[in-house]
Amino acid sequence: MATHIQNDDLPGNATSRTFLGRDHGGVPVSFFIQASPTGHGPEPHTHPYAEVFVLHEGSGTFLAGKETIEAEAGSVVVVPAGEVHGFKASSTGPLRMTCIHTSDAMTTEWVDG
């Protein structure tokens, strides 16, 4: 049976909503619907699975391993499992994107430094 969920019904706030697959029948994917203000984003971290960023509006600077990627709306950034990564919104307006975790739950290890 299909499930239909309104964005506002997902846990979170005005800048981030979270979907965990384990809470929706064990679907093997989780994601954030993100709207990051300029200069905001997570510090470097890793996941034991790949993460895919789909940019809908704005732009961001992504750290992926030793690489820096400038990405804008219409781009997809894929970070392999275990690779240190993070991003900061670089556009004058919010960076709107979907951050897809290829797991039914989100596991994050923050990197010092």
Where are these regions (language model features)?
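A short, N-terminal "cap"/entry segment at the start of jelly-roll beta-barrel domains
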Residues: 1-29, 109-113
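Conserved short histidine dyad/triad with adjacent acidic residue
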Residues: 32-47
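Glycine- and acidic-residue-biased ligand/ion/polar-headgroup-sensing regions
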Residues: 50, 55-60, 65
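Short acidic-glycine-tyrosine-enriched beta hairpin
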Residues: 67-81
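Ligand-binding loop in jelly-roll beta-barrel domains
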Residues: 81-107
